[in-house]
Regions:
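Structural and coupling elements of P-loop NTPases
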Residues: 1-696
Length: 696
């Protein structure tokens, strides 16, 4: 592939709801740009972007793909992202590497939850954007409704650039709102000028007014002239658009049909014309040597530096670190320093990815997106630079996974293979986490949703030929007591020769601190138990609390006091007193009104106002306690509640169902509380075989 300078580069991320047409838009762009001889289809599994077997099987995007489109001697790096929320980590990575966005909206489906989330991401990363309305070949599609809904949500910055022309239910042409001229497609795909149809003139007036209003909002001078009834010249409008679209204060709305490849030409032209090249954006890091701010700003003349925004670790194509060059020019065989890993690595060859196909390139200029192969220790969010000028860039914030299932190998002996395969998946996917829960004897897999975990399990089989079973995770309970008891236990064994003797009198009571397993004290007088055996008695308590007598869960919140006992000058030993203390604990615990404690999570749920009643009702069913509500932006409410952890299983799926995908949640462990009696009974019964009872 040819080398492109910074001013001839556009990095554009496609965002939008799942199924709105992002991948088919890429196909239309690639076809129109002459990259392909025919357009692939998502349902046929032959698109440039959706190359993964899981994507082909499921007919939707799972990974972000880079597809460079060459248009008017400009390299447009299109980042095609998943629209489904389970794969939001891929989208967040792509947004961090982009300089602008196209929010794709289906003209038939209209504004969806994914549209709003896409807009929020653009706001978060301060990305200038366009909206492209697809499906205009479908009779039920309404461009006008989409524009109106966008204006209601986001105000006067929404600027419709085009207006569709329909005849007999067919999408046959468009009106250019700026030029107030119409064009019609001929059978060979070319366009010809035509008169604006009479039936379009009213809508043209409405769209023209919206465009002028958006331009007027950009300066006081324009605002005064607009309210004075003065017209703007076409050159003034174009200049205002060039500046303000790039700054994000005007959002153009375009439209077309991906299937017919109509409206794509004007989209590509406007991407080059209005969306900013990297040199128009800012980019800062920290010099690790001096701790000073480093203004990279995609300046090719500065020392070379780059940021790894995504990793591909596929056994079929190898490992590639996808980078964005933040400053300087990277060349073949460069030596780069990874400040995060404190290691220098030789770059070798430079690549540009086209879907899953790497193409060699001699150099990558500041602002360009490329790939490096087989960097040994590099991972996503690492910074690369020279050792003399070590730069650190802010790591991309990736969503925290809260959906959890336990997993185990379907076939015995595959455990090590599964562990290694998961490490490779997690190298690619920062929202996938494997955690060993030794307390409950389980391994847990965290993801963004059930579908995410199912895809991960499927990838393990497709790529690495290992299978896992996903099941509901066990919840870690605790045991404690509610009253004080006095216990005596004498451990005495004689089997000829040297025997064992340990005798303790102890009290056990609630300590009042559920964050500590136990508190140990002694108040022995008269040497009934020699001091040198006190540590052994405490050791007995320490070991006993690891596995409680009720359900074999760890014990918390117990105060143990040794106040009396006896010893034998020959047969007593540390082991004997340790065993005596352990048995005293087990015996006394069951007489001290024991209970099971369950973990409680502090939950935050953010939903639109209209769903708050449903959410609070559902939380009540989950034994939750709503503690408060706080209004947030755009008509949303944050609901704060305490909920038992065991009741949060499946909450991600249920919340999406209740809110149409618009609700989000997060939680963290808060404390342990007494579990209801029915929950305790079930848990005690289920774990009866694990319990060690006290010896008589």
């Amino acid at each position: 592939m040819n080398v492109y300078t910074t001013d001839r580069i556009r990095n554009v991320v496609l965002l939008g709801h799942g199924g709105c047409g992002k991948t088919s838009l890429v196909e239309a762009m690639a076809y129109l740009a002459g990259m392909t001889s025919r357009m692939g289809k998502v349902e046929d599994g032959n698109t440039i972007s959706d190359y993964d077997k899981e994507e082909m099987k499921r007919h939707f995007s799972i990974n972000t793909s880079v597809v460079p489109i060459i248009w008017e001697d400009t390299k447009i790096n299109i980042l095609d992202t998943p629209g489904y929320f389970d794969f939001v980590g891929e989208t967040e990575e792509a947004v961090s590497a982009a300089d602008a966005a196209i929010v794709v909206v289906s003209g038939k489906a209209g504004i969806e939850v994914g549209t709003r989330k896409a807009w929020e991401l653009c706001e978060q990363y301060k990305l200038p954007r366009m909206v492209f309305v697809t499906d205009m070949d479908i009779d039920e599609a309404s461009y006008r409704q989409v524009v109106q809904d966008l204006q209601e949500l986001y105000g006067k910055k929404i600027a419709p650039f085009h207006l569709p022309i329909r005849e007999n239910g067919q999408f046959v042409g468009y009106v250019n709102v700026l030029q107030q001229r119409a064009k019609r497609w001929k059978e060979n795909g070319e366009v010809e000028k035509t008169d604006v149809p009479d039936y379009s003139k009213e809508n043209l007036g409405i769209c023209r007014e919206a465009l002028m209003e958006a331009v007027a909002e950009t300066s006081e001078e324009f605002m005064d002239r607009y309210f004075g009834g003065e017209e703007f010249s076409e050159d003034e409008i174009r200049q205002a658009l060039r500046v303000n679209v790039a700054e994000g204060s005007i959002v153009p709305v375009l439209m077309g049909s991906n299937i017919l490849a109509r409206g794509i030409y004007t989209l590509l032209v406007d991407i080059v014309k209005y969306l900013p090249s990297p040199e128009k954006r800012t980019c800062t890091g920290i010099n690790a040597k001096t701790n000073e701010v480093y203004n990279a700003d995609y300046d090719f003349a500065k020392a070379k530096s780059a940021y790894i925004w995504k990793t591909i670790a596929d056994p079929f194509i190898g490992k590639y670190s996808l980078i964005k060059v933040n400053s300087g020019v990277l060349k073949t065989d460069d030596i780069l320093f990874n400040q995060h890993k404190d290691v220098e690595e030789k770059v070798g060859k430079l690549y540009v990815m086209r879907g899953n196909k790497p193409e060699e390139v001699k150099e990558l200029h500041a602002g360009d997106i490329g790939a490096l192969a087989k960097l040994s220790g590099a991972t996503t969010t690492d910074s690369l630079s020279t050792k003399t000028n070590p730069i650190l860039y802010i790591r991309t914030t990736i969503s925290t996974p809260y959906t959890c299932k336990r997993y185990k190998a379907k076939n015995k002996g595959d455990e090590d293979k599964i562990s290694q395969a998961l490490q490779k998946l997690m190298l690619e996917d920062l929202t996938l986490k494997a955690v060993n829960d030794s307390e409950n004897g389980q391994t847990l897999l965290y993801g963004m949703g059930d579908q995410h975990l199912e895809v991960a399990a499927s990838k393990l089989f497709e790529r690495y030929k290992v299978e896992i079973e996903l099941k509901r995770p066990k919840v870690a309970f605790r045991e404690t007591i509610r009253k004080k008891v006095d216990v005596e236990y004498k451990y005495k064994k004689q089997s000829g020769g040297h025997g064992q003797y340990g005798h303790v009198k102890m009290t056990f009571e609630p300590s009042g601190d559920l964050e500590q397993p136990y508190v140990f004290e002694q108040c022995v007088v008269g040497g009934a138990v020699p001091k040198n055996y006190f540590p052994a008695v405490e050791k007995g308590v320490q070991e006993a609390v690891l596995k409680g007598p009720m359900a074999a869960y760890p014990v918390v919140g117990v105060k143990a006091v040794l106040y009396d006992g006896s010893f034998h000058p020959v047969d007593s030993s540390e082991m004997a007193f340790k065993v005596a203390a352990m048995q005293a604990f087990k015996k006394g615990f069951m007489d001290a009104s024991p209970i099971l404690l369950e973990p409680i999570a502090s939950l935050k749920v953010v939903v639109p106002d209209k769903y708050t009643g449903d959410i609070m009702g559902d939380l009540n069913k989950r034994r939750g306690r709503v503690l408060g509500m706080n209004p947030t932006e755009h008509g949303y409410q944050e609901i704060i509640a305490d909920v038992p952890v065991m009741e949060l299983y499946g909450y991600n799926t249920d919340l999406r169902s209740m809110t149409g995908g618009s609700g989000t949640f997060s939680y963290e462990f808060a404390r342990y509380e007494q579990a209801p009696s029915d929950v305790q009974e079930k848990e005690i019964e289920a774990r009866a075989s694990k319990v060690d009872r006290a010896e008589e």
